[in-house]
Amino acid sequence: MKPILVITLLMLCLFTYSQRITNEFFVFESILSNDSVYNSFEKKANLIKESGFNGIEIFELDQFNEKLNAILKLGFKPSSLYTKLDLDEPELDPRLVDAIKMLKGLGTTICPYIIKKNKVSLHSRDKEVDKIAIHLLRKLSDLADESGLQVAIYPHLNFYVERVDHAASIAKKANKKNLGLSFNLCHWLATTNMDERLELNKQIRTLSPYLKMISINGANNIISSKSNIWGDYILRLGEGNFDVKGLVKYVAIDLGLNIPIGIQCYNLKGNKQLVEKISAQVNELKSF
């Protein structure tokens, strides 16, 4: 019996250490924003596809039709649509309504960032403004549901909704099955102190019923003193001292959330090799 027991234990250990994350990984459109070779959306999308990613973000509604057509022509996926939800406007942008209809059945996550003139200060809330957000998000969620799509509120530094707890509170009150939030590493770092960061896993676990997506990048786990904090909070994947692999493992394996994972690329300098390096880092993240 002992040899059988040993073999069984070895097989269990092998299975444990060979788990592979199967979440969808996609790249934000901001990558290679000033590259002279990949100077069109279609060229960029094709490079990203050839580099092994599952999809690409569509950034905003300008040139939406052209971008979507380019993606579909390549047999690729529009993983997310990053778009504005303006609380000073009484209705949804008609272009967004049309875009969601065109995305029907494509599995795209709609990612609204929420803005409001005369935004309240960080860490504060405005119940009346929240009610406006909830009203518009319910409309957006119903529209997205008709196309089989998920909606993930996108917390963003200096916008009306900039913290994940605020986004979760709004999503909970809106009470739509396809509405939740995106955990964006760079914006989370920009809106938290060191004590809050020690509770990351606890925060993620609390957010998990509402998590529709996460976005990651390399980062330094410090309180940035730079005039441009993104110099610490948005680095190439694989750079910086923040434990990105631990975050991905906790979300995808420990919590078992099979949600899309976006790669933040804002203001990163580089060319084709940048995409290749990020792709290599993603492959490393997938294996445990």
Locate predicted features.
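Acidic-and-aromatic substrate-binding clefts and catalytic sites of carbohydrate-active enzymes
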Residues: 32-40, 55-67, 84-95, 120-123, ...
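Histidine-acidic metal/acid-base catalytic patches
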Residues: 19-29, 39-42, 142, 164-167, ...
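A cross-domain feature marking catalytic cores of carbohydrate-active enzymes
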Residues: 29-32, 58-60, 80-87, 110-116, ...
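Conserved, mostly hydrophobic/aromatic
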Residues: 48, 56, 71, 151, ...
